[in-house]
Amino acid sequence: MRPKELIGSKSHEDHGLDSKVPLSFAEMIDLDSINDQDIKDLIIKERAIPVTISIDEGIRPKIIDSCGMTCSFCHNEGTPVASAYSKTTLLPNPRYRGGRVSIFEKTNNVNFIPGTMQPDDNFLDSLLQTKQALGIKEVHLTGGEPTLHPMLPQIVAMAARVDLDVKMTSNGENGKRQIAECASAGLSKINFSIFGTTPEELAMTQHERYQNPALAARKLDALHESINEALIHGLKVDANIVMSSLAHADRVARILDRYGEKVTIRIQNDLNNQRESRLAIYKFLAMVNAEPEELRIDAGTADAKVRYRMPTGEVIIFKQIRKTMLPETCGDCTLNNPTDCKEGYYGTRLYVDTNGKYKIGICLLRMDLTQDIDDFINSTLPGEILQHRERTKPTQTALP
């Protein structure tokens, strides 16, 4: 992301942003509807903090479909679980071998099986094409679980060689074996997804066949080993955790106690329980005496983050969704309503199918919009995305 500092007033007009879209959750919430004074006070403070605008210049390559987790809420980047299909299986026909799921597969009209990206000329060409068409400067590797890819360091190195900032989302499953070499190859940051902080918590998120605390304990050990390995090798580390209600406060506290200032905690609200989740996060932040410092918005996507700091120095990021839409593509979509589409346009994703064809997608709920990369580049979508980015970026870099 390319930051542009904006200090002072937070009006949409000053920032050159779409005035129909609230800057953050703090602007969406009616203070009169809140009875808790601690939450009210924190929201008022959040409304007054400085804003930093970053321009979305990233893409998310799904480099592998394999994963050793069986999370019941997994969207699998919009694609089917590859291991559930044979070459003769027609879509959609989920069989979920091994307990894995893809929660949108039955309804998103996906029409391909995900393959595995290789550090070859086809992968390099896809990066160069997206750089030219969309001005991409960052790749964020996803899966499945990226650390299960046997050639992950080579993929990182290839992206880094063409001047792309390389980041990754991981559950830490195989990180201890991969992270050192990835760091040497040019990886800059890992976002670790934390689905539970005790074996019992993690086990409850898995398919019923695998709700085994002993197995979950081994998964947690691997996660902690991966986080430590990333810190040893100088990588930036974020820990992502969803907080559905105040009952989950202990989970966040355990991560803070374990890693302190070494790791940035990113708390995400539950999209299926939005109001309770948001208020619970504000209450937790008030309970730990965290103070809001900065609102960061990624112009061109629905991503927004508020940085909080605790009195002891630890940073907590309240990750938020400020729902923005592509004007043409999203404008006439039947899912463009508060019930069906909770995120809006969240950026581009890069896929490869089992035939080795690279594709670009723009929506997990509308995988029918995913196109072969050449078709995408020759379509109107790159222009629409660039115009959307331009329309939502700031008109000035500093306020008087």
Predicted region positions:
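Surface-exposed amphipathic alpha-helices with a cationic face
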Residues: 75, 131-132, 153-161, 183, ...
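Radical SAM enzyme [4Fe-4S]-AdoMet core and its adjacent flexible, acidic
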Residues: 195-331
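Hydrophobic faces of well-ordered beta-strands that scaffold small-molecule active sites
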Residues: 57-61, 139-141, 166-168, 190-192, ...
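A short helix->loop->beta-strand "cap" motif at the edges of active sites that frequently abuts
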Residues: 136, 163-164, 187, 232-236
